[in-house]
């Protein structure tokens, strides 16, 4: 992908950049792989806000993605590379020889016409999916399962990748994008290659309205709220927060306060913590 810049014809355009969508081959998604997606606006089933700063935005349809990659031994060919409004990565439509169609995350350098396969006997080739035990040490992977058969949960965002570092018994050592080194069951599957659309992080939104198109609402500082709304609120003019440390809206310490639970079950699988 490339980054498209604009002439400063307005203040909104001055610092705005967009994806040039050079890799996208169609703007019409596969209808059989679409599902309705209703707006939640950050509310739970009681109508209470559980996730702040969400709401509005353009209407979307969900693309059903094959994260499990469990169609073993059946070759498929890449039909299209498509934009997905629900994630930062692009997706690829795969036409299998038995007639089935599935979407997968599009890895870097995957192109229309290339063949992909799943299963233990697959080649170490971009877009193929194999159990970690069958992937050589040093290989770059993405879409990693945490439990066999559950589907990929790790390394799915645009431009991310992990690396297989070694094999220890029934586990495989994997270094994640964050720098964390983690043990993953060797029966778990991963896809070969780095997730595409790697320049996504370089895009500048440019104006508030574009954030609203994406369904992002404004983030308001606690110090400009009333005391009823935030621990930092109240006072005359620009007042200090009056606390020993900054607080979240719910009165919990924040900005550096560790929130990970002690004795978490997955701690035993983390060999080295992520970089701070």
From Swiss-Prot:
GO terms for biological process: cytoplasmic translation. GO terms for molecular function: rRNA binding; structural constituent of ribosome; transferase activity. Keywords: Ribonucleoprotein, Ribosomal protein, RNA-binding, rRNA-binding. It comes from the Bacteria. GO terms for cellular component: large ribosomal subunit. Residues 7-20 have a biased composition (Polar residues). Residues 1-20, 219-276 are annotated as: Disordered. One of the primary rRNA binding proteins. Required for association of the 30S and 50S subunits to form the 70S ribosome, for tRNA binding and peptide bond formation. It has been suggested to have peptidyltransferase activity; this is somewhat controversial. Makes several contacts with the 16S rRNA in the 70S ribosome. NCBIfam families: rplB_bact (TIGR01171). Part of the 50S ribosomal subunit. Forms a bridge to the 30S subunit in the 70S ribosome. Belongs to the universal ribosomal protein uL2 family. This is Large ribosomal subunit protein uL2. It comes from Bacillus mycoides (strain KBAB4) (Bacillus weihenstephanensis). The lineage of its organism: Bacteria, Bacillati, Bacillota, Bacilli, Bacillales.
């Amino acid at each position: 992908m490339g980054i498209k810049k604009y002439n400063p014809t307005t203040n909104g355009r001055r610092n705005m950049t967009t994806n040039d969508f050079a890799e996208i081959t169609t703007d019409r998604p596969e209808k059989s792989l679409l599902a309705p997606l209703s707006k939640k606006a950050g509310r739970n089933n009681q109508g209470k806000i559980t996730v702040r700063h969400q709401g509005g935005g353009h209407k979307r349809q969900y693309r059903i993605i094959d994260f499990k990659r469990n169609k073993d031994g059946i070759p498929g060919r890449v039909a299209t590379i498509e934009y997905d409004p629900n994630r930062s990565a692009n997706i690829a439509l795969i036409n299998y020889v038995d007639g089935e169609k599935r979407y997968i995350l599009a890895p870097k350098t995957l192109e229309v016409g290339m063949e992909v396969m799943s299963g233990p006997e697959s080649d170490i080739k971009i877009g193929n999916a194999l159990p970690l035990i069958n992937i050589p040490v040093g290989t770059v992977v993405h879409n990693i399962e945490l439990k066999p058969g559950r589907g990929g949960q790790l390394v799915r965002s645009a431009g991310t990748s992990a690396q297989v570092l070694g094999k220890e018994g029934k586990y495989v050592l994997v270094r994640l994008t964050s720098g964390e080194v983690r043990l993953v069951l060797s029966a778990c599957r991963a896809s070969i290659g780095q997730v595409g659309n790697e320049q996504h992080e370089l895009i500048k939104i440019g104006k508030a309205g574009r954030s609203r198109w994406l369904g992002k609402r404004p983030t308001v500082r606690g110090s400009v709220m009333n005391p009823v709304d935030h621990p930092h609120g109240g006072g005359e003019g620009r007042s200090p927060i009056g606390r020993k440390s900054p607080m979240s809206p719910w009165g919990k310490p924040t900005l550096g306060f560790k929130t990970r639970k002690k004795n978490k079950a997955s701690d035993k699988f983390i060999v080295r913590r992520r970089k701070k």
